[in-house]
Amino acid sequence: MLSTEFETPLWENLSRVCGIDEAGRGPLAGPVVAAAVAFPRHFKPTGILEKLDDSKKLTAELREELAPAIRESAEAWAVAVVDAEIIDRINILQATMLAMNQAVESLAATPELLLVDGNRFRPVLPIPYQTIVKGDSKVFSIAAASVLAKTRRDELMVAYAAEYPAYGFDLHFGYPTARHVEAIARHGRCAIHRKSFKLRKLGEK
């Protein structure tokens, strides 16, 4: 589990440090979602937040418990959604950058430093940033962003499951599982599928 030890030395000179992460780069369907989270200076996690970790390591139930606690404890937070149509138009990397920047721009207060999960970022606002590979398993603020992005995306995919029941989006959330690929083979793609993501198994090029 994570503490704010990464942020602590940064808070000596900065009052607002913001973690950024995304969910949904790899699925065949649905949006990519990014979140930005900034905690109060010298914040120390207590209670349920002591269980925070990379969202991929947490159960869905624990993520659902953590999300409201993150929102309540954060000084500022925002989530941005970029749908499949835009992903197809500008590609998944550009769509991910767009979602991350939209999340930052939506924050109630402007950060002084961005801590971004991964190895690349293209900022829109003139804010210093640091990319951190596997940051969601190293940095508290990034892990918090990963949970907010993941829970929001999961909510959207569950809603899409009701709209497009043939695909089981509430089970695989758009990822290329055997069941999902079989559903595409049987029914074709629906409106939220990413047309630019091809399936070689189905002979798509």
From Swiss-Prot:
Q: Which InterPro entries match?
A: RNase_HII (IPR022898), RNase_HII/HIII (IPR001352), RNase_HII/HIII_dom (IPR024567), RNaseH-like_sf (IPR012337), RNaseH_sf (IPR036397)
Domain named RNase H type-2: residues: 15-205
What EC number(s) does the entry state? 3.1.26.4
- UniProt binding sites for a divalent metal cation: D21, E22, D117
Write down the chemical reaction(s) this protein catalyses: Endonucleolytic cleavage to 5'-phosphomonoester
Q: Name one GO molecular function term.
A: RNA-DNA hybrid ribonuclease activity
The keyword Hydrolase is assigned to this record:
yes
Q: Which Gene3D superfamilies match?
A: Ribonuclease H-like superfamily/Ribonuclease H
For this protein, the record's SUPFAM superfamilies field holds:
Ribonuclease H-like
Principal localization reads cytoplasm
| Family classification | Belongs to the RNase HII family.
Q: PANTHER family this protein is in?
A: RIBONUCLEASE H2 SUBUNIT A, RIBONUCLEASE HII
Protein name, per record? Ribonuclease HII
Taxonomic lineage of the native organism: Bacteria, Pseudomonadati, Chlorobiota, Chlorobiia, Chlorobiales
